[in-house]
Amino acid sequence: MNKPRYDILREEFLAVVTELIGELTRFDKQVAACNPKKAMFRINRDIRFATDKRPYKTRFSAGITPKDLRRPSAGGGSTYYFQIDGSGKLQFGVGEYLPPAPRLKAIREHIVNDATGFAKVMKNKQLRATYGDLLDEDKLQRPPKGFDPQHVHVEYLKLKSFFVWTDIDLKVNQPDQLVPDLARGFKDAFALVTWLRSVEMSNPEE
């Protein structure tokens, strides 16, 4: 890795993340205190169980959350995630990706208890136009145990993530459009963020 060049690119990416947090705060006040440095993912790859032993990633990525908790296991809730790779591809998504079992169960229960509200989110015009449907990666073949197989949202109950995702070509000749484009894309998914934040976790001691 060319360390001097990486350091320059990292500082440029940090500036993007910092500016983006400011733009997101216009419609989502909860991310105002997000630390941009903590939002950025490390360049080092975990190669312990990987066949690809290259030590460094070929992309810059960040996850913006209210509590600086990017990972589902840390209980961070909805994340505004984006990455830029070396080929000029911009990918971004919003929601909860592979949340831990207790959180996943709570989301599924909320779908059942707030079927109308969830349906409204899934029909949101901005969400559908930008992202389409929820990511169905690792979707269950059968309904999860304890849930009605005839429920109107049974296909969504099978999901393991409640996350929307898209990718576009980076406007390399219009770098000043990056943050506005991301902010617009993230705002289009704010209905999903709001709904997920309404999911209540039960007290484990109950």
List PLM regions with ranges.
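Glycine-rich, often proline-containing surface loops adjacent to acidic residues and nearby aromatics
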Residues: 1, 87-92, 160-166
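Hydrophobic, proline/glycine-rich low-complexity stretches
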Residues: 1-2, 194
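Gly/Pro-rich turn-and-neighbor structural signature
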Residues: 3, 7-53
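A generic structural motif
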Residues: 5, 88, 98-103, 168-174, ...
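Long, solvent-exposed, polar/charged low-complexity segments
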Residues: 8, 13-24, 111-112, 116, ...
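A generic structural signal for short, non-catalytic loop/turn and secondary-structure boundary residues
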Residues: 33-36, 55-57, 75, 87, ...
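Aromatic- and glycine-enriched beta-alpha-beta binding-site module
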Residues: 44-113
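A contiguous pocket-lining binding segment that forms or flanks enzyme active sites
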Residues: 93-143
